[in-house]
C-alpha cells in the first residue's frame, strides 16, 4: 500500500497499482488481488495534503517526506471539526480529487489548532479505509500472519491499531524499509526465491533492520584525533555515567552495532534524556532535532 507502482502482468503488460494483496506459500508469494492506482490511493492523498494543505515537503532534499509531521499533528486534533471540508476534497471513493484546496489552506494559515484538526481528519480517514481493505482480504483469505509493506505502512498511528482490529492475527510483520528504498532488498529476494527457487530463510537469521555501516573503536578514535581541537573526549567504563549525566539534564547520544535501515531509529542509534524534566521535550526538538514542538518521542523500556 503506497502512492503507486507498476506490476508486471502475465500478458506482458504493466498496470499501475496502489494497493495489492499477496499470499505467501513456501518460498514464493502469489498475487491475490490488485487495486488500480485511480481507485484507491492513500499514499497520494497524504502527499497532496502534506504539500497542498500544510505546505510541507513531499519528498527530496533537504527535508525529505514530511508526512510523518502531519501524522504527529493528528494526535492533537478533532477529526470531526472540519470533516465537511475534508469530504469536499476526498470523495466517497478513497482517492483525492483535484478540487479547491483554498478553504483548508486558509484554515492552516490562520490558526495552528486547525492544522491539528485537519490532520486528525486525514488520519481517521486513513484508519477507516485501511481497516476495511485489510479486513476484506482477511475475511476472504483467513490467515494468522499479516505482512505490510509500502510507504503507507510507515503510518505507525494506523499500524498500531492492527492487532486490536484483527485479534485473529497472531503475527504481524512490517519491514523497516517498507517504502521505495526497500526495493533494494525486495528485488534480490525475488530473484533468490522466485527465479532461483532457493528455500525460505528463517526470520531470526534474516532480520533486515541493521544493515548499515558499523563504526569500530579504531575508526572512532581516528575521527576524534582528527577533530581534537573541537571535540574533547574521555573513555569511561562505568555505565552509571550515562545515568548521572541524564540526571543533570544532559542530552546523550548513544550508538552501537550497525546503523538501522529505514526511517525509524530502532535502538542502535538513540538520543537519551531524562523524561522527568518538563522542559526536555522542547529542548530536544529545538536544539537537537530542529523540528516542531509537537513532535513526539518513543520511550525506551527495559524488559
What label would you give each PLM region?
Residues 1-91, 135, 145, 154-155, ...:
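Flexible beta->alpha loop and helix N-cap segments adjacent to enzyme active/binding sites
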Residues 27, 108, 112-115, 140, ...:
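A generic structural signal for ordered alpha-helices
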Residues 70-124:
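Active-site cores of enzymes that catalyze phosphoryl transfer or operate on phosphate-rich substrates
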Residues 120-144:
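Phosphate/ATP-binding catalytic cores across multiple sugar-kinase/actin-like superfamilies
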Amino acid at each position: 500500500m503506497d502512492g503507486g507502482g507498476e506490476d508486471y502482468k502475465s500478458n506482458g503488460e504493466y498496470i499501475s497499482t496502489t494497493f495489492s494483496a499477496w499470499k505467501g506459500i513456501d518460498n514464493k508469494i502469489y498475487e491475490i488481488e490488485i487495486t488500480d492506482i485511480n481507485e484507491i490511493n492513500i499514499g497520494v492523498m497524504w502527499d497532496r495534503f502534506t504539500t497542498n494543505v500544510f505546505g510541507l515537503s513531499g519528498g527530496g532534499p533537504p527535508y525529505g517526506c514530511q508526512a510523518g509531521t502531519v501524522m504527529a499533528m493528528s494526535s492533537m486534533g478533532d477529526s470531526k471539526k472540519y470533516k465537511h471540508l475534508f469530504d469536499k476534497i476526498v470523495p466517497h471513493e478513497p482517492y483525492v480529487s483535484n478540487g479547491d484546496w483554498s478553504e483548508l489552506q486558509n484554515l492552516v494559515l490562520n490558526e495552528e489548532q486547525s492544522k491539528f484538526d485537519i490532520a486528525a481528519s486525514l488520519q481517521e480517514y486513513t484508519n477507516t479505509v485501511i481497516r476495511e481493505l485489510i479486513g476484506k482480504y482477511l475475511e476472504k483469505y483467513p490467515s494468522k500472519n499479516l505482512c505490510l509493506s509500502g510507504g503507507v505502512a510507515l503510518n505507525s498511528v494506523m499500524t498500531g491499531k492492527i492487532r486490536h482490529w484483527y485479534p485473529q492475527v497472531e503475527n504481524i510483520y512490517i519491514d523497516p524499509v517498507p517504502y521505495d528504498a526497500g526495493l533494494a532488498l525486495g528485488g534480490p529476494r525475488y530473484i533468490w526465491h522466485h527465479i532461483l527457487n532457493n528455500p525460505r530463510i528463517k526470520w531470526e537469521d534474516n532480520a533486515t533492520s541493521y544493515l548499515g555501516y558499523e563504526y569500530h573503536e579504531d575508526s572512532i578514535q581516528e575521527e576524534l584525533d582528527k577533530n581534537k581541537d573541537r571535540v574533547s573526549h574521555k573513555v569511561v567504563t562505568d555505565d552509571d555515567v550515562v545515568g548521572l549525566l541524564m540526571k543533570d539534564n544532559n542530552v546523550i547520544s548513544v550508538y552501537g552495532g550497525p546503523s538501522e535501515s529505514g526511517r525509524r531509529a530502532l535502538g542502535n542509534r538513540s538520543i537519551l534524556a531524562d523524561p522527568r524534566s518538563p522542559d526536555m521535550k522542547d529542548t530536544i526538538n529545538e536544539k537537537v532535532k530542529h523540528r516542531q514542538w509537537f513532535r513526539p518521542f518513543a520511550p525506551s523500556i527495559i524488559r
